[in-house]
Amino acid sequence: MSPSAKYVQLDLNSPEFQQSWFELEADDAERVRAALKKILKLTWQDVYKDKGLHWEKIQSIQPPTGVDALYTFRLSKSARAVGYRHGNYLRVLLVSADHDGAYGKK
């Protein structure tokens, strides 16, 4: 497998992500878990192309120092997440059941 075809690894250690995930209703939290499990079976090229994830760059938020860009992606019908790529890791910063909340418009 070429380096660009390696499976995505997840970093779910952000306290904001953990807090927001734990605050979801049980059904939403389970759908998020299933989506994250799916992402582990994808390459980065798969993530970029996956119609269900709707991976898109966030233009309205300045990324933290050292991060090229922040992205939002769908984890369920009602939940989106914010994160960024760091090497082969997807560092997930938060999950929001309110789509506008994922874009910082709350």
Task: Name every feature range the model reports, one short phrase each.
Residues 1-79, 85-106:
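Basic, Lys/Arg-enriched alpha-helical interface segments
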